C-alpha cells in the first residue's frame, strides 16, 4: 500500500488539472496562433507560467485504484500487475480468462 499522503497528492493534482484545463487550453491556443502579435503571445505565455505547477496534467501519476502503487499499472483496468493477476485468478475481472494453448 502506498503512503496515503502520496495518493492524496495525486488526487489533489487531478482536481487542480481539471479546474485549470480550460484556461490552459485557451492560453496554449493563443500561444500557438501565428496570427496573434508577438506581444499577445508573450503575455499568454506569462499567464500560463503563473498558473499552479500542479495544474499541468503531466504531473499526475497513474496509480493502482486498489493499492495506490505507482508502477506497473495497466491503464485499461487501473490496476497494477500484481492486483490484476490476483483478481483475474479469482474471476473478479469481467471477460478475463487465463490463457491456454
From Swiss-Prot:
Q: What are the disulphide bonds in this sequence? A: none
Per the record's keyword annotation, is RNA-binding included, yes or no? yes
Task: Write out the GO biological process terms.
Answer: translation
Q: Which GO terms describe its cellular component?
A: cytoplasm; small ribosomal subunit
SUPFAM superfamilies for the chain: Glucocorticoid receptor-like (DNA-binding domain)
Q: Which domain of life is it from?
A: Bacteria
Q: Which InterPro entries match?
A: Ribosomal_uS14 (IPR001209), Ribosomal_uS14_bac/plastid (IPR023036)
Matching Pfam families, A to Z? Ribosomal_S14
Q: Which UniProt keywords apply?
A: Ribonucleoprotein, Ribosomal protein, RNA-binding, rRNA-binding
The reply to whether rRNA-binding figures as a keyword in the UniProt entry is: yes
Molecular function (Gene Ontology), one example: structural constituent of ribosome
User: What does the subunit section of this Swiss-Prot or TrEMBL entry state?
Assistant: Part of the 30S ribosomal subunit. Contacts proteins S3 and S10.
Q: What HAMAP family does the record point to?
A: Ribosomal_uS14_1
Annotated function: Binds 16S rRNA, required for the assembly of 30S particles and may also be responsible for determining the conformation of the 16S rRNA at the A site.
Q: Which family does it belong to?
A: Belongs to the universal ribosomal protein uS14 family.
What is this protein called in UniProt?
A: Small ribosomal subunit protein uS14
Which organism is the protein's source?
Answer: Bordetella pertussis (strain Tohama I / ATCC BAA-589 / NCTC 13251)
